[in-house]
Amino acid sequence: MSEIKVGENESLESALRRFKRKCARAGVLSEVRKREHYEKPSVKRKKKSEAARKRKFK
């Protein structure tokens, strides 16, 4: 869980901006999108191999 400490004279907007940046760096949103729907293990393997193939031929 990402958390920040808001400074004494810090505005709410800047604290929110820091929190969003920290969440993005931690990969929270990408993890949520990845886990939004269940994916069968066979589908995961297929996607992984297709991604590897794309990287190889790029």
From Swiss-Prot:
GO terms under cellular component: ribonucleoprotein complex; ribosome
GO biological process: translation
Keyword Zinc-finger: no
Residue ranges of the region described as Disordered: 34-58
Transmembrane parts of this sequence: none
Keyword terms of this UniProt record: Ribonucleoprotein, Ribosomal protein
Single GO molecular function: structural constituent of ribosome
Biased composition (Basic residues): 43-58
Recorded family membership: Belongs to the bacterial ribosomal protein bS21 family.
HAMAP family, A to Z: Ribosomal_bS21
Protein name in UniProt: Small ribosomal subunit protein bS21
Species this chain originates from: Clostridium acetobutylicum (strain ATCC 824 / DSM 792 / JCM 1419 / IAM 19013 / LMG 5710 / NBRC 13948 / NRRL B-527 / VKM B-1787 / 2291 / W)
Gene: rpsU
